[in-house]
Regions:
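Outer-membrane beta-barrel translocator domains and adjoining extracellular loop/strand segments
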Residues: 52-58, 82-89, 125-133, 163-172, ...
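Outer membrane beta-barrel transmembrane domains
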Residues: 82-83, 180, 184-280
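Residues that define the transmembrane beta-barrel architecture of outer-membrane proteins
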Residues: 53-57, 92-98, 131-137, 173-181, ...
Length: 280
């Protein structure tokens, strides 16, 4: 790493934070069908590296208006374990920011397009690093096309916070404009099992603020390098039934020379309810 990268990482570690790429605000998008009706999804996911673990329990409720348009929202409950700047073990639990997603989906034989606009309400505790204390937003766009079992994809996003996505749960919250780029492939090994790999880059600009989830009442303010990152991740996803999703992943932050293991468990409560109701 260059001197700037080392300095930024040192500052982050002094706040007790680590960098991570990963969880989507609405994991329900992975398993919710396109049919019209209510959706409900319960997800538990987390990330672990040498500095600690960040996990969250996310309950998501939404409504599909048809094959193209849907709304959903929820609020995560965080469980944070790690080591602070003094070397002491710390834990921090609590509600995060409530979020709402507006989704548009356009499936086409040439290329599929999915766009999600996410808004965050400052319901989390700022002193605990679970919120910035301000409303935030993020806009993500995904393009993919399947060639048999192989599905290449590209994601492009912009917002005023580095979003949490599926494969990385970071122990801090950011406030500041940034763009995100991710590209990779997913391969279906068989009906219930798939693997994937992707490279990513987060490119911020302007003033950035970082709120630690490990050291209370700690806020770091700096330039674009504070939130910049790039690297790659790999994952394996298993769906043993149409109601359950399991994921295991690995992330390598090249910018910070940091390795992280991630996991996810999701239950499609809405689909389970609809099937039981239809069977009556």
């Amino acid at each position: 790493m260059n001197r700037i990268s080392v300095a930024v990482l040192s500052c982050l570690l002094c706040l007790g934070v680590t960098h991570a790429w990963a969880q989507s605000p609405a994991p329900a998008s992975l398993s919710v069908a396109d049919e019209k009706g209510w959706t409900a999804y319960l997800g538990f996911q987390g990330s672990s590296n040498t500095f600690g673990q960040v996990m969250d329990l996310d309950s998501n409720l939404g409504y599909n208006f048809g094959p193209h348009f849907s709304l959903d929202g929820g609020v995560p409950i965080y469980f944070v374990r790690g080591t602070n700047a003094l070397g002491n073990s710390v834990s921090n639990n609590g509600l995060g920011d409530m979020y709402a997603n507006l989704r548009l989906k356009f499936r086409n034989p040439t290329v599929n397009y999915f766009t999600t606009l996410t808004g965050y309400a400052p319901t989390g505790d700022t002193a605990s690093g679970l919120s910035t204390g301000r409303a935030m937003w993020d806009w993500n766009n995904r393009f993919d096309r399947s060639f048999g079992r192989l599905t290449p994809f590209v994601e492009v996003g912009i917002g005023d916070t580095v979003p949490i996505t599926r494969f990385y749960n970071r122990p801090y919250t950011t406030l500041g404009y940034n763009s995100q780029l991710k590209g990779g492939v997913q391969y279906a090994l068989w009906r219930y099992l798939s693997v994937g790999a992707a490279g990513y880059a987060v490119e911020p600009w302007g003033q950035q603020k970082v709120f630690s989830k490990l050291n209370k009442r700690n806020e770091l303010v700096g330039g674009a390098d504070l939130a910049r990152d790039n690297g790659f991740n790999t994952w394996m996803a298993v769906s043993p039934s149409q109601f359950v999703d399991l994921e295991l992943g690995y992330d390598r932050s090249v910018h910070y020379s940091l390795n992280t293991v991630t996991f996810g468990l999701g239950v499609n409560v809405g689909r389970l309810f609809h099937q039981q109701h239809a069977g009556q």
